From Swiss-Prot:
GO biological process: actin cytoskeleton organization; axonogenesis; cell adhesion mediated by integrin; cell migration; cell morphogenesis; cell projection assembly; central nervous system development; chaeta morphogenesis
Quaternary structure (record): Component of the WAVE complex composed of Hem/Kette, Scar/Wave and Cyfip where it binds directly to the C-terminus of Cyfip.
Parts of the chain that traverse the membrane: 989-1006
Protein's membrane topology: Single-pass membrane protein
Presence of the UniProt keyword Ion transport in the record: no
Organism: Drosophila melanogaster (Fruit fly)
Protein name: Membrane-associated protein Hem
Role this protein plays: Plays a role during growth of the oocyte.
Compartmental location: Cell membrane
Gene name of the encoded protein: Hem
Length: 1126
């Protein structure tokens, strides 16, 4: 005699929860095995080995009765096979164990005569139907694993060879594999004993499903999801008889109905209402989900199942008709639903954002809306990826391509964010609701129960006490709520009250069941909001539809009207974590890497697109800024002049000339210009980038704004260098003033980006522009400073040294003295103070310092050459130094000097470089005085008032970096010192002899016809006047390095030597030697003027100033006579 079953002892509720979770875990593992076996790269290596090919064929053919004696090929590798296939094999063993547990539980539920009704015992019915569908899906996916027989047979053969006996579970496992070759046939046989239970569950779905599977027009008529449709009840809490049923997934119900009725297809002829929902489900889709991206072409599958059943031709005809309807109408119906939901969710989001307090009474609306939207997205994904097998001729799949999908995704994310943000508002509301209304109502209904068994009474009391004990203070104190025991107790109660012989039947206390169902929803909102959000709006399915996810993102990126919603795609990557299962930890790493990789790619592409739009706008603004430059007005002035002169040949082209500002004239605002469209696209894309400060995926936080900052920074740096337009071959470069105008226009556009996105654009400017003052940027690329450094030192100054370009003291620029065309560029356009100020603005003190160091390096090289010339003439120079008061000896010894012209040439080159450096420093001082006047004045004070020694050296370096003139140039001194031998006692003598060499060589300049002094440019035609700067700077630095503190004495000695040499020139009778004598006299005057150590009184004592005054008169007159004025 069979023992009686006590329902209270069967723990049906607990078993349903555990088996559903375990079934999902095993389904995950079987799914991964199927994917691995279907991919040649990831399948177990043994299945592809040529040496095992015959053995595997033998195993598959004889499966499951395999004779291992004929499998000699696997004897030596049996241990490796067991190790490699162990996980696969034990997954199938777990499936067999799961199958046994499911069958046992279903049998127990049948024996207890449980009645299922989703409107009353929601959890019990839902978990039962979920378990059935998971079980069916498992068996169908199992039948799709390609190498299942090979894997199991190979493992078992290796196991038997190693242990001399087969695995104990293999016979049953092998039989299960054979039984489920055609899974639905076997499953239908298994479920014959469970038809009563399955029938009650499916029949209860008829009313719920009919209200859910409606076209968009019906939703509009019902004002579904509308908060403003009936303002009178706006503040009232939403209450329905089937609270939990409101947000069941329609996709889940489709699977319950289709798979349930495939197992119990006799119902189709017995219950018309069931047949109606069956056909409705079949007409709304042509594929049904099994798991993730595994789907079933359901109509063909049903036809194949019904084909062998007598009298089912009518059913097969209905299925075919449903398939045709689905192919023709389903896509349009679902498209209209998505269209409705876009508007409905947007309205919900706007109202809830404005009045978050409504999240309390109207929370269910949020979850219903999310659930409906998620169902439509899942439908679109699966059907887009699996188009109908038999397409109608000429019918396109345009309804399966939704360009507005990002908007729907965005509104879902917006609502999810609102729920999380105002979770405490919802908690506060429902804690009061539970304690103030639900607990009171439950107490009243408990008192009205005429008969209540002890177990049920204890649970009811516990439920009441839990709800009644809640207070608002718990919310204010951020106390963690935990209502899982509450919900589990209600689940147990459903089981006790649904058995056939229950003393307290749930069907007779429907109102009590509905109250507890609504209380379950309220507790979930209080303690389990995240789980509700996952249940209603999880989109982790995108992880398995990689291509469509990527395609939708790029489609959105290319469609400006949807740009603002593109942030939804990175946000969805945070959902991917939800699809992992603890029973399959090995896939966790892959899903994690996938989600991190995708969110990074998406944010990078969004930032790049925004950067490209900004760059296009910047280019246009730079073009317009360039059009405002003075050089472009010549054409307009020329045409206007021609008009006045009535020159028709020129004036007819006036209309073709586009004036700056013409782009601002419009006939109508409706005609969008390219710039309008770009600004609109930028606004939309920046809205998306600015939508959330961080996107949290797994344990990482991604900042969209930082992606934009980095892209802008990189592009700005690259474009800054590009705008220099430096051509290595032709050595052409942009004028600094024009570059500065373009940079300012570019920066003005970037500044406006702050109006759209909360980014620190000043930080971008500082990073980029500061890098441009260095020789290389952070990417190792050349900078503006480096390019201009190269051009000025290698192009401009070399051209000056070659002749035809003169440094003009009064114009403060290098000017050409040859006819136009002899020099490939106008040096004045690059070297006047305005241009150098622009250069100083661009490269700053750091860039100028780098340029200065380069120039000093060139000077140091020239000085080294001069020292070698001194060494060659050492003895002669020593004699000249000691005999400056003996004219005859000086004359004779001077004739013995070698390379006099080379000395003068190198000193001139040094002078040109120093003059240019002084110009650059003057421009820098002007810029700093404008930018940092107080700091610059402090630097000047330090320079002027600090005592000598190390302190003055530091102050001089600081002053030099700021562009201020110093008695001795610290950079030049440092550079020369680096070239000097560490222990060289003759360095001072060399400096003295070099000074003598230059002093006695100066008169020879008078022989040169290009040494003529041009008053109009205040300089000599061959830049001889630049020697004044060279003499003062070079000798000052050299004597400072020697450290003998005799600079002033040595410069007096130089003046004595130079003046006596020039005075002897006055006694020279050779006209060739005195050709430009007056011009050279002026050089002596310039040396004294520029020297910090010499004075005019000292000059007067050595050289009559009347000669200099007469020289000035003479060169002015001579220039007028020759007509050399520029």
């Amino acid at each position: 005699m069979a023992r009686p079953i006590f329902p209270n002892q069967q723990k049906i509720a607990e078993k349903l929860i555990i088996l559903n979770d375990r079934g999902l875990g095993i389904l995950t593992r079987i799914y991964n095995i199927k994917k691995a076996c279907g991919d040649t790269k990831s399948k177990p290596g043994f299945l592809s080995e040529k040496s095992l090919e015959s053995s595997i064929k033998f195993i598959v053919k004889r499966f499951p009765n395999i004779d291992v004696k004929g499998l000699n090929a696997i004897v030596n590798i049996k241990a490796e096979i067991i190790k490699s296939l162990s996980l696969y094999y034990h997954t199938f063993v777990d499936l067999l164990d799961f199958k046994d547990n499911v069958c046992e539980l279903l049998t127990t539920m049948d024996a207890c005569q449980i009645h299922l009704d989703i409107t009353l015992n929601f959890e019990l019915t839902k978990y039962y139907l979920d378990l059935v569908v998971t079980y069916v899906s498992l068996m169908i996916v199992l039948s799709r694993v390609e190498d299942r027989k090979a894997v199991l047979g190979l493992y078992n053969a290796a196991y038997e060879l190693q242990n001399n006996q087969a695995d104990t579970g293999f016979p049953r496992l092998g039989q299960m594999i054979l039984d489920y070759e055609v899974p639905l046939k076997k499953l239908a046989e298994e479920f014959i004993p469970h038809q009563r239970l399955l029938t009650s569950a499916l029949r209860s779905l008829t009313s719920i499903y009919a209200l859910r599977n409606l076209p968009a027009d019906k939703w509009r008529e019902m004002q579904k999801l509308s908060l403003v449709g009936n303002p009178a009840i706006l503040l009232k809490a939403v209450r329905t008889d089937t609270m939990s049923c409101e947000y069941i997934s329609l996709e889940a119900m489709d699977r319950w109905i289709i798979f349930g009725l495939l197992l119990n297809h006799q119902m189709l002829g017995q219950y018309p209402e069931v047949n109606k929902i069956w056909l409705s489900a079949l007409e709304s889709s042509w594929v049904v989900a099994l798991f993730r991206d595994e789907v079933l072409q359901i109509h063909q599958y049903i036809q194949a199942t019904f084909d062998g059943i007598k009298g089912y031709s009518k059913r097969i005809g209905e299925v075919k008709e449903a398939y045709n309807t689905a192919v023709q109408k389903a896509a349009l119906m679902h498209r209209e639903r998505r269209k409705f939901l876009r508007t409905a969710l947007k309205e919900l989001a706007l109202i809830m954002t404005d009045q978050p307090g409504l999240l309390g009474p109207k929370a269910i609306f949020i979850f219903i809306g999310l659930c409906l939207a998620r169902d439509e997205i899942l439908w679109l994904l699966r059907h887009n990826d699996n188009p109908p097998l038999l397409k109608n001729k000429g019918k396109s799949n345009e309804d399966l391509v939704d360009r507005q999908l990002p908007e729907l995704l965005f509104h879902m994310e917006e609502l999810r964010a609102l729920v999380r943000k105002y979770s405490q508002v919802m908690q506060r509301y429902y804690v009061q609701y539970l304690s103030g209304f639900d607990a009171t109502d439950l107490n009243i209904r408990m008192q009205s129960l005429q008969m209540c068994p002890e177990d049920e009474s204890i649970i009811f009391s516990s439920l009441y006490n839990t709800a009644a004990a809640l207070t608002v203070k718990q919310v204010e104190d951020n106390e963690l709520f935990y209502f899982r025991p509450f919900r589990l107790d209600w689940f147990r109660l459903q089981t006790y009250m649904s058995v056939g012989k229950a003393a307290l039947r749930i069907a007779e206390h429907a109102e009590l069941a509905r109250l507890l169902d609504s209380m379950v929803f309220h507790t979930r909102v209080v303690d389990n909001l995240d789980e509700i959000l996952v249940e209603t709006s999880d989109l982790s399915i995108f992880c398995f539809y990689n291509k469509m996810f990527d395609d939708q993102f790029h489609m959105c990126l290319e469609f400006p009207a949807q740009n603002r919603y593109i942030i939804a795609f990175p946000l969805i990557c945070s959902h991917f974590q939800n699809c992992t299962h603890e029973m399959c930890p090995e896939e966790r790493h892959h899903i994690r890497e996938r989600s991190l990789s995708v969110v990074n790619i998406f944010l990078e592409e969004m930032a790049k697109e925004a950067k490209n739009i900004i760059t296009t706008i910047c280019d246009e603004q730079c073009t317009m800024a360039d059009a405002l430059l003075p050089k472009h007005c010549a054409k307009i002035l020329s045409v206007q002049s021609a008009r006045k002169k009535k020159d028709k040949s020129k004036s007819k082209h006036f209309d073709d000339i586009r004036k700056p500002g013409d782009e601002s004239y419009r006939k109508t605002r409706e005609d969008l210009t390219t710039m309008d469209k770009l600004h609109m696209a930028l606004t939309e894309l920046c809205f998306a980038i600015n939508y959330c400060p961080t996107v949290n995926v797994w344990e990482f936080a991604f900042a969209p704004r930082e992606y934009l900052c980095q892209n802008l920074e990189h592009r700005f740096s690259r474009d800054l260098v590009g705008m220099v337009m430096f051509n290595q071959e032709t050595m052409e470069i942009a004028k600094p003033s024009e570059l500065l105008a373009s940079v300012r226009a570019y920066m003005n556009v970037l500044q406006t980006v702050e109006n759209y996105v909360h980014i620190d654009i000043t930080r971008v400017f500082n990073n980029c522009l500061l890098q441009q003052t260095q020789a290389l940027d952070s990417h190792g690329e050349k900078t503006i400073a480096a390019l201009y450094n190269t051009w000025y030192s290698e192009v401009l100054l070399r051209r000056v040294s070659a002749g035809n370009i003169v440094f003009s003291i009064n114009q403060k620029a290098f000017v050409p003295i040859s006819p136009e065309g002899w020099v490939p560029f106008n040096p004045q356009e690059f070297s006047d103070l305005n241009e150098l100020r622009a250069l100083a603005e661009l490269v700053g003190p750091y860039g100028i310092k780098t340029l200065n160091e380069t120039l000093m390096w060139h000077i140091a090289n020239q000085v080294q050459e001069l020292k070698s010339l001194v060494s060659t003439n050492k003895e002669v120079l020593i004699t000249l130094r000691t005999s400056f008061d003996k004219p005859e000896v000086m004359k004779e010894q001077f004739k013995r000097l070698q390379d006099v012209d080379r000395v003068l040439q190198r000193m001139t080159i040094i002078g040109v470089i120093i003059c240019f450096r002084n110009l650059v420093h003057e421009a820098l001082v002007d810029v700093l005085d404008k930018r940092i006047p107080f700091l610059l004045s402090s630097v000047k004070d330090f320079q002027e008032h600090l005592p000598g020694g190390d302190q003055i050296r530091v102050a001089s370096e600081m002053a030099s970096a700021a562009g201020l003139l110093c008695k001795v140039d610290p950079t030049l001194a440092t550079t020369l010192k680096s070239k000097k031998p560490e222990f060289d006692e003759g360095e001072h003598l060399t400096a003295c002899l070099l000074m003598v060499f230059v002093a006695v060589s100066i008169p020879k300049l008078a022989r040169n016809e290009n040494s003529f002094y041009r008053a109009t440019i205040d300089g000599h035609s061959n830049n001889t006047h630049c020697m004044a700067a060279a003499i003062n700077n070079i000798f000052g630095a050299l004597f400072t390095i020697c450290g003998q503190s005799d600079m002033e004495d040595r410069m007096k000695e130089f003046l004595a030597l130079a003046s006596s040499s020039l005075l002897r020139l006055g006694q020279e009778s050779d006209k060739e030697a005195t050709r430009n004598r007056e011009s050279i006299y002026l050089l002596l005057d310039e040396i004294v003027k520029q020297s910090p150590f010499l004075t005019m009184d000292l000059l007067e004592s050595c050289f009559p100033y009347v000669l200099i005054r007469n020289a000035y008169h003479g060169v002015y007159k001579q220039e007028q006579i020759l007509g050399l004025a520029l």
